[in-house]
Swiss-Prot record:
Residues 1-30 are annotated as: Disordered. It is found in: Cell inner membrane. Keywords: Cell inner membrane, Cell membrane, Membrane, Transmembrane, Transmembrane helix. It is a multi-pass membrane protein. This is UPF0283 membrane protein VP1870. The keyword Cell inner membrane applies.
Length: 346
């Protein structure tokens, strides 16, 4: 009979050493190649601007029309009316036809009022064309290295925009510039100190009209009436923006400006804004909680905001600076929040 083996006591440390000696590949050094390097990715919380928003920077101004044509037609019409009035008065006096003389006086007065209104519209159209010329001149100065023209140009812009000499921003700008500054630097300071104040007021106007239009369409069951009211409010918004920037508009100049705004909106792809708005709804976890009517109101509000931003770009005297440009996303968030607050189902 064989002898029994003596007992063996295994310690935990000895076992670990034995395992490490049996499998040395577990502790061997590993070298990663460049392709296997892991790069941490930073997650951005803010939504990246869409290509449609970046296209807002490009402004398409209306082409200058034939100034001589409108002036010639107006002068010819005014001359013929005056000639006819004088001839009719002379004929009525010679024939002692006092009734005809009275009618001639009445028609001449009405024609004079009409000519005055037409002349006023032509004058406002000319001022709007001059405003666009100032914008183009500002773009040239911003991208040039010239010296000596910036101060005179900005003072002219302030006069055209109705900026008073007592304006704090304008006074600060005057005390900040010196002969060593280039024209581009002077325009940059004028934009940051004077025009930026107008931009803040204009942004409030656009945001207010956009949110109100969105809420109006979202809660009202009358689609046709809503669209008429929205169209009227858009005209009102453009009028308010023109007052902020000191651009006087008449009926003809207002239509010309509105056409320019629509051209810019079409060029920027305004029809794709509903996709951006839908992404905002998803990000706010509102999908399935708002009605189709609320979606329509949201679309109207976004389009109103874009119309307002395009009007701002056409009405402000200087081109947008990238770091101070009003973004569509700022107003869009306010519109989405407004629609969500009044249409979310409990």
């Amino acid at each position: 009979m064989s002898e029994l083996k003596q007992k063996q006591i295994f310690s935990e440390k000895a076992l670990e050493k034995e395992q490490q000696s049996d499998s040395p590949e577990l502790t061997a050094q590993k070298t990663f190649s460049e392709k296997e390097t892991f790069v941490p990715v930073k997650i951005e919380e803010d939504r990246i601007e869409t290509e449609q928003e970046l296209q807002l920077e490009h402004v398409i101004r209306p082409r200058p029309g034939r100034k001589w044509l409108a002036t010639s037609v107006f002068a010819t019409f005014a001359g013929l009316v005056g000639w006819q009035a004088v001839d009719s008065v002379v004929t009525a006096v010679q024939t002692a036809d006092w009734l005809a003389l009275g009618w001639v006086g009445f028609i001449t007065a009405v024609a004079s009022l009409g000519l005055g209104a037409i002349g006023k519209e032509l004058w406002k159209l000319r001022k709007l064309r001059n405003h666009f010329s100032i914008q183009e001149e500002a773009e040239l100065l911003v991208h040039s290295d010239s010296v000596g023209k910036g101060k005179v140009f900005c003072e002219k812009v302030a006069e055209e925009s109705g900026v008073l000499a007592e304006n704090p921003g304008f006074d600060r700008w005057q005390n900040s510039i010196n002969p060593a500054h280039s024209d581009a630097e002077i325009l940059d300071m004028y934009d940051s100190m004077v025009v930026s104040q107008q931009d803040k007021l204009a942004t409030k106007v656009v945001s207010q009209h956009a949110t109100e239009s969105a809420a109006l369409v979202a809660v009202s069951p009358l689609a046709a009436a809503d669209m008429l009211l929205v169209a009227w409010r858009n005209f009102k918004m453009i009028d308010n923006l023109s007052k902020v920037y000191g651009v006087e508009l008449g009926y003809a100049s207002r239509i010309k400006l509105l056409r320019a705004v629509f051209v810019n909106m079409a060029a920027a792809g305004a029809s794709e804004l509903a996709i951006d708005a839908g992404m905002d709804l998803m990000s706010m976890d509102l999908a399935g909680k708002v009605s189709a009517r609320a979606g329509q109101g949201l679309g109207v509000g976004i389009l109103t905001a874009r119309l307002g931003l395009k009007a701002m770009a056409l009405l402000r005297p200087l081109p947008w600076y990238p770091d101070r440009q009003v973004k569509l996303g700022t107003i869009r968030k306010a519109v989405v929040a407004k629609v969500a607050s009044i249409t979310m189902k409990p």
